[in-house]
Curated annotation (Swiss-Prot):
The modification N-acetylalanine is found at residue 70. The keyword Chloroplast applies. It is found in: Plastid, Chloroplast. This is Uncharacterized protein At2g37660, chloroplastic. It holds the Pfam family NAD_binding_10. Keywords: Acetylation, Chloroplast, Plastid, Transit peptide. It comes from the Eukaryota. It comes from Arabidopsis thaliana. One of its GO terms (molecular function) is oxidoreductase activity. Residues 1-69 form a transit peptide.
């Protein structure tokens, strides 16, 4: 930083020309600094030669230390939500869009129809998570990834609930849990790692500790087994992560229940095994902002509406979690 070497006897400080001092600030003609910066001037007495020579005020050499402290600016995080066309994914994407000072939201969907459904423009990409190349444009330049993709079973036609029994399910060709919940999620993790993302939030399901869980029998496809494998792959990736294993998802308003965290499916042994999609979405968004959420895996459910105290302190919520997987 260059300083003027002219001294003056008409100004209280021998290093600063009189016409550069205004109410404690330094004019930009003297020192070039950002408008948001602050300057602090400290007078030091020294026996060494000053750039300005002796001061007529003290007879001693004086120098000025200029400290430039630019105002801290935080750039919004660019966050990609995959599965943004799904019921929970839509909510996460919307929440990120609403907090534009903190996030730049991107979405990844499978079809043009899904893109139109969420009013997606240039920030919503169409891709197939089973094909790494097709998701590369969406991942490029992101800071964080929220994975909300999942295989979706279809009910076989002809089921009549009046006759009792249970419905049967199947998965479309190419859309089995192994292909979507394992290979598809692995592709996303690999692509994100290559792009240098700082965090991945993965939404899964409770029940993965029980190989005989009823969800594994749907379509005979072991959906929880493949989900668990993807979660382990993420935990081993070295990328800061938050794994959220949600209870039974409900299409209800969020923000009005006390949220509960657990581990190893212990919440499945209680009466509090469900959670609103909107609450899961909020936990995803909060995880992107809190260091306490990183390198943690948690089961997530809520107390019934009207009991307990609605959760507002998410830092405290994540602090309760001690498990990494």
């Amino acid at each position: 930083m260059a300083m003027m070497t002219t001294t003056t006897t008409t100004f209280f400080h021998p290093l600063l020309p009189a016409n550069t001092y205004k109410s404690g600030a330094v004019a930009s003609s003297f020192v070039s600094v950002p408008r948001s910066s602050s300057l602090q001037f400290r007078s030091l007495v020294s026996d060494s030669t000053s750039i300005c020579g002796p001061s007529k005020f003290t007879g001693k050499n004086r120098r000025v230390s200029v400290t430039v402290s630019a105002a801290a600016t935080t750039e919004p995080l660019t966050v990609l939500v995959t599965g943004a066309g799904g019921r929970t994914g839509q909510i996460v994407y919307k929440k990120l869009k609403e907090r534009s000072e903190q996030f730049v939201a991107r979405g990844l969907v499978r079809t043009k129809e899904s893109k139109e459904k969420i009013n997606g423009e240039d920030e919503v990409f169409i891709g197939d998570i089973r094909d790494t190349a097709s998701i590369a444009p969406a991942v490029e330049g992101i800071d964080a990834l929220v994975i909300l993709t999942s295989a979706v079973p279809q009910m076989k036609p002809g089921f009549d609930p009046s006759k009792g029994g249970r419905p049967e399910f199947f998965f479309d060709d190419g859309a089995y849990p192994e292909q979507v919940d394992w290979i598809g999620q692995k592709n996303q993790i690999d692509a994100a790692k290559a792009a240098g993302v700082k965090q991945i939030v993965l939404v899964g399901s409770m029940g993965g500790t029980n190989i005989n869980h009823p969800l594994n029998s749907i379509g005979n496809a072991n959906i929880l087994v493949w989900k668990r494998k993807a979660e382990q792959y993420l935990a081993d990736s070295g990328i800061p992560y938050t794994i959220i294993r949600a209870g039974g998802l409900q299409d209800k308003d969020g923000g009005i229940r006390e949220l509960l965290v657990g581990k190893d499916d212990e919440l499945l042994e209680t009466e509090t095994r469900t959670i609103a999609r909107a609450d899961v979405a909020e936990v995803c968004v909060q995880a992107l902002q809190l260091e306490e959420a990183k390198f943690k895996a948690l089961d997530l459910a809520s107390k019934p509406e009207g009991t307990g105290t609605p959760t507002k302190d998410f830092k405290a919520l994540f602090t309760q979690v001690t498990t990494k997987f």
